[in-house]
Amino acid sequence: MINATQLFKIALPIILQNFLSSFVNMLDTIMVGQLGSVDIAAVGLGNQVFFVMNLMVFGAVSGGSIFISQFWGKKDFEGIHRTSGIMLCVSVAITLFFTIVASVIPEYCLRLYSKDPDVIKKGADYLRAVAPSYLFFGLSFAFANAERSTEHVTLPAIATICSVIVNAVLNYILIFGIKVTGADGNSIVIIKAYGVTGAAIATVFSRIVEALIVFVFAYVRKYEVAVAPSKFFIKQPGFLSKYVKICIPVLINESLWGIGISMQSSIFAHSGTDVIAAFNINSTVSNLLWPICLGCGSATAILVGKTIGQGKYKEAEKLAKNLCALITLIALVLGLLLIPLTKVLPFIFKVESEVIAMASVFLIMKAAVYSLDSFNMCSVVGVFRSGGDTIFALLMDVGLMWVVALPLSWLAVLVWHFPYWAVYACILIEPLCKAVLGFIRLMSGKWLHDVTEG
């Protein structure tokens, strides 16, 4: 049986990587937050395009990771190479589409979330500038996930560290500019302040650095996934159809879930600019601790998938139950830590006191369901998918969101005119119901399938 030491050996670099990625988003929000509520709203809504794209890429790549983890358990390197090639192709196709959309029709995208012309204008400037980063993100994300699925978790973390440093330095320079005082006492502009556009340019350069490190050093160190490009396209009769059968539900799952989360921003945007600014602050701060749960969930997927690939099915069932319980307990503690963070919001975000008050309420409500969110993530991403149970994961993960939570929330805003906290309560019905369904499925053991057989 895999012990806690082995779990955290894999989880810690992933946690670090995910934490730093969240920190970059928070850093963007904090720095742009010095410019005002409109700028926070513009960047937050602009990033909804990336959020939806990210989840589609995550879905396609996660589907491939199911195969790679199980192939890794079998030491089937040809299967690993073939799957990695498909992951790269699909990831590039998705990110290319979103690059074109963000470059050509950014205003149309933003009107889905806000009617404020100032927010739309600044958000469009941000999207046009940040769009080139999507392709580099797609390449590095797919290849880094292939590396992690073969238990090479350190290099992706190092790449993210370097990316964060580049992003932080360029953010400061390009958002605020650089001025020096001349001998006559007048300010001389060395580098112009670009505001939200500067934040986007910094993101582009940081993504380029990340992609270069993930690829170059994998080949230098001769990782299992770092092979000649021709080996990525070795054909095996029936494999592509099997890949599609497993991955399409994951891709649909992540796409619908991402659009649903994005719709939450649209719901609050219809309540006013201050409400959406508060909701963006809540999302940024609560997501800062989420990488710990996500890292443990990703490690669970690797370990459970590898154990299934080794043919140890009973051990995989027991492992899945133990790890879900552990991660839920960790998240319970982390959720409690969100509450004192409400006291430091006024010192971090230079926005109106009403926005801070609303963000604090959002955070306290989020803390109440943090452990449920974590269990749902671990069961869906870490267990059901690694066991090839992607159709049930799809139905559980997005069914309640689209059938219950989103319709209730829209009615609460547009028809019943509920206050912001009551609207959020409608959204938070979802994780409670989802956790009940996930627990029943986990205990049944019906989620376990060896997708590499045959």
Language model features: what each stretch is:
Residues M1-I14, I68-S133, G177, A183-C247, ...:
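Short alpha-helical transmembrane segments in multi-pass integral membrane proteins
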Residues F19, F23-A41, L110-P117, I173-Y194, ...:
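Helix-terminus/linker motif at the lipid-water interface of multi-pass membrane proteins
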Residues I2-I30, Q34-L35, F51-G63, F67, ...:
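N-terminal transmembrane alpha-helices
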Residues V32-F51, T83, P117-K122, V196-T197, ...:
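Interfacial/gating helices of multi-pass transporter permease domains
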Residues I40-I100, F137-P156, S265, A278-T342, ...:
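Small-residue-rich hydrophobic transmembrane alpha-helices
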Residues V61, V130-S149, P156-N167, A199-V214, ...:
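Short runs within selected transmembrane alpha-helices of multi-pass transporters and secretion channels
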Residues S21, N25-D28, V32, N54-V61, ...:
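Alpha-helical transmembrane segments and their lipid-water interface positions
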Residues K9-D28, A129, S140, S163, ...:
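Transmembrane helical elements of multi-pass membrane transporters/channels
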